[in-house]
Amino acid sequence: MIVSKAFDVEIFPNLFSVTFVDVKDYLQKFADCKGALTDTLTVKEIKKRLDEVKCDVFYISDTDDSQLLNLVSYLNKMQAHYITNEDKDANISQVPVRYDLFGFNTLNYDNLMIAFFLMSFNRYDNTKYLIKALYEFSKKIIRLQDDHEAFYQDNQVTLARKYRLPFASVDLFKVFHLDAASARADKDTGERIKLSKGLKGVSINLKWYELLDFKLPPIDEEEVKLYWSNKPEYKGCTAAFINNLGINDFDRYVLPKYVEPMLHYNKNDVFIVCEMIRQKPDEIKLRYSIEHAFGIHVLSSARSDISKKLLTKLYSKATGLSPRDFEKKRTERTKLSFKKIIFPHIKFKTKQLQDLLESMKKVSIYRTNKDSFSTVVDFMGTKYNIATGGIHSIDAPRELRSNDKYLYIHHD
């Protein structure tokens, strides 16, 4: 039996929270909906049903540690275990239970934060110092995520990555390849740079009813007195002065009066994760099926990564070679001749394209940036740019409106 939950972690200098939502219950609450929720239900009805979804919300602050051990216990109970089941005929059986936690960018952030929390919760005298350590670790993760070498060489991050969490992970950020949702070319080198899509962008695609961006009210005298005035660099500063510094909200201190809005924001993010599952269930089922059929871990893999893992598994089985014996083997090329990669069956009927084909067969490139090869072809009234990135038509910006008198044909 698999217990599925979605979760999200939030950290501030004085507060740490984790929100869990029961995925099965969420799906049951909206089982009658097809497509986006807003296509079927009113906002009022959506909110009503969301309020009824099973949620578990935990937070600790520098002044409130009442939920600390509850959170630790909640996480530890996710360890794989057996439960005793008795059917109507009094037959007793042992049923294996595991927890699968769904999230967004969990492999590179939330899982590490949970691991660090479980490694550290009993090492500090009070939650003030525990949260300080969690906050500093969070900043380190964010700082190093664009530097993969430093990220994987950092001792603290490595310990968290290797920590055996009590649950299995399904990272939808990876599943839907949102870590490389689009790309741009570096203007100097031509190198392809991947661009990710955040949860807020995803919520727009899902037509989610509420687009939330967490925003704290301006710093007031209470926050200055309790926190900022105790920091040497801000001692004597007014609230107005500190507000003008443009401090990020996630680097602010969450006063008790702001806890509920923060938790609502956190829960909304988790609901969006659940909605991703509801709208794309086949993608999730596919990964469970492949994992069961082939015994490879693909719950957090994009389709391209699944194909690579499958091919590696099947090739290893067919050849008897260990994956490490062939995965890194490759042919290093300093020169690429187009003649070697243009298939012989490619032929054209028009003289213009026949000449183009022959000229391209004579081309050799020594790098793959945008300046290595580029040519423009004017064919049947449309200009095309052929380069290392592919072929694209060159069109002037315009708006074309069809009617019964005109048929617009584009050869691209």
PLM features per residue range, with description:
Residues M1-G35:
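Entry/capping segment at the start of metal-dependent catalytic domains
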Residues M1-V3, A80, V97-Y99, K405-Y406:
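Short coil/turn segments at beta-strand junctions that form active-site/ligand-binding loops
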Residues I2-I11, S169-D171, I409-D412:
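Two-metal-ion RNase H-like nuclease active-site motif
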Residues E10, D188-K194, I204-L212, I219-D412:
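Conserved "right-hand" nucleotidyltransferase catalytic core of DNA-directed polymerases
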Residues E10-F12, V21-K24, N105-L107, L112, ...:
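Anionic group-transfer/hydrolysis microenvironments
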Residues T19, L112-F117, G201, N205, ...:
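Residue-level signal for well-ordered alpha-helical scaffold segments within enzymatic catalytic domains
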Residues V21-V23, F116-R123, I290-E291:
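Short secondary-structure boundary/capping segments
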Residues C33-G201, K235:
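Conserved DEDDh/DEDDy metal-dependent 3′-5′ exonuclease domain
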